[in-house]
Structures are given as C-alpha cells and as structure tokens.
C-alpha cells in the first residue's frame, strides 16, 4: 500500500505568526514534525505542503521534501487536496495528514492509523487519533478538542466543549483529538468538494463535515499525548518535555 504523509504548514497565524519556523531547541518546529514523522514505519513519502517560500527554504535546508500549494487554499483539507493532485496519487493510495503544529507526535501513533486501514479494508473512509485526557485543565479548554465514539471506535462527535457531560459524576474518562488524519486520495477529493457543514461552521472543526454527511471516522486511541503548539508558551512546554525525554 502506498502511504504518503503530508504536513500542511502556513506562515500566517493570528495567534502565532511564523509558527512553523519557531525554534524549538535550535531547530524550526516544522523540522521536529518532519523528523518525528520520518521515524514511522510504513510510509512511502513525506512532504510538507505549504504556500510560503520561507517554509519551503527551511524544509529543503534540512533535506525535507516540499510541495507548493495554492495561497488561496481555504482550509487544511483544501491544501492537502491541492498537494495530492500535484503528486499524482492513485485513488486508493493512503494519505496521512499530520498537522504541522505537532512537534512531539509519537511515530507509533502514525503507525496506528495506518494499521486501521490495513486491518479493516473498506470498512470506513477516514481515521484519526484520540488520547485520554490526563491534564484536567484541558477538559474545558476549547483549544483541546474533545471526542466521543461508539463501542466499535467510530466517532460520534467532536467538540470544543467537554463531552460527554456527566450529570451525576465528574469521574469518567474524556478523550481529546490528536491532529492526525488518514484517508484515501479518492475520499480527500470527495470531502473537499462537500459544502461547509452547519456543525463544522459552528465549532470550526473540519472533521465534523465528514460526520454531517454520513461518513464514518474510525478512532485509534494513542498511548502517547502530543502537545499542539498554538502559542509561544506551548513552545516552552515542548522544550521542557524534550528535556526529560
């Protein structure tokens, strides 16, 4: 099975401009993401998908591969769709979408989503990762997206609010979403062509579009948390984690 991992990266960010190039222990964040991903087994190719020449230069500077995408991409999925069209992938090729703000992603977590497609061919069109929340401060933080899933590990909903809500107890597991997606090239193209979903627009979560239009999302639960970098403070958290790893 041909497996291409794409890391969408854009320079502009309202909260953290230039985030992909922010240094973490002397290396740009995008390099940490790329090098972590390269340790995952089963990948055919890895590319950074960007529209920014500064990011392109940084990636090529450490020996990584880049595909330049349109600056008009309205979303991460549109950027991924643009990239796979340029790369000429086949309909049944597997695409891994690893968010470029995951510098501490564990390579085995990437292998988990690949394994879902290998073990359950044809049963679903999209897969992603979850992690049981340990840090209680994340429970009500809208930057940490929560998720619920059924007994077969198919997603029921994703939200910036705490879900599920325990009416009579607070002692129950809550899972957060980690920024890794897997799908076939054919599904990416179909997904990108769908109109914006009502719930997607409310929560500002693209994965809800898939659920709103009746597509199944399989969930793998990772044993490893991953810090999502949204602010300069998150960079410091990453450096602290790396110091003890």
From Swiss-Prot:
It is an enzyme of class 2 (transferase). Activates KDO8N (a required 8-carbon sugar) for incorporation into bacterial lipopolysaccharide in the Shewanella genus. Keywords: Cytoplasm, Lipopolysaccharide biosynthesis, Nucleotidyltransferase, Transferase. GO terms for biological process: lipopolysaccharide biosynthetic process. It is found in: Cytoplasm. The keyword Nucleotidyltransferase applies. One of its GO terms (molecular function) is 3-deoxy-manno-octulosonate cytidylyltransferase activity. The keyword Transferase applies. It catalyses: 8-amino-3,8-dideoxy-alpha-D-manno-octulosonate + CTP = CMP-8-amino-3,8-dideoxy-alpha-D-manno-oct-2-ulosonate + diphosphate. Its EC number is 2.7.7.90. Pathway: Bacterial outer membrane biogenesis; lipopolysaccharide biosynthesis. One of its GO terms (cellular component) is cytosol. Pfam families: CTP_transf_3. Belongs to the KdsB family. The gene is kdsB. This is 8-amino-3,8-dideoxy-manno-octulosonate cytidylyltransferase. It comes from the Bacteria. The lineage of its organism: Bacteria, Pseudomonadati, Pseudomonadota, Gammaproteobacteria, Alteromonadales.
